[in-house]
Amino acid sequence: MKINHLGIATKKIEDVISFWTDSLGLETMHTEIVEDQKVRVAMLPIGESRIELLEPTSEDSPISKFLEKRGGGIHHIAIEVEDIAAALQKARDNGATLIDQEPRIGAEGCLVAFIHPRSTGGVLLELVQTTDVGGAS
């Protein structure tokens, strides 16, 4: 297991990306739209992890709702796991409140699932499986 990325919510990626690229020297790995989450994503590698900038593409997206309640900032921490189904089952068996009962396709074609902050001490946790999923690794 390792930290795959930190998700940061922002109203517009263009308004903040220059800080990460110009001020810190990070490079944008890629951007994409994740249709089912109604979000635009920009990934910026940093060491063995990444910063994931999240911009809502719709007023009813989860990121838009987050921004309305809390403003921009850290939205979630993503932990990379080898077997997401097993990790979800273990969390379920230990009483965690799962947002996603089953993994789904997320950014970069990875399998993802979220665990509710009430089970993690207040942090939205994303589980990510990158291997053998849509060519991602």
Segment roles from a protein language model:
Residues M1-I17, G72-V81, T131-S137:
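N-terminal beta-strand motif that seeds the catalytic metal site of vicinal oxygen chelate
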Residues D15, I84-Q89:
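Short, conserved charged micro-motifs
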Residues P62-I63, A87:
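Amphipathic alpha-helical interface surfaces
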Residues V16, L24-E27, R50-I51, E59-P62, ...:
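Short loop/beta submotifs within extracellular cysteine-rich repeat domains
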Residues I3, W20, L44, I51-L54, ...:
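Short, structured motif recognition centered on aromatic/hydrophobic residues
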Residues F66-L67:
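Regulatory and interaction patches adjacent to catalytic/ligand-binding sites
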Residues I8-R50, D93-A96, Q101, I105-G109, ...:
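Core segments of cupin and vicinal oxygen chelate
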Residues A42-M43, I79, L88-S137:
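Vicinal oxygen chelate
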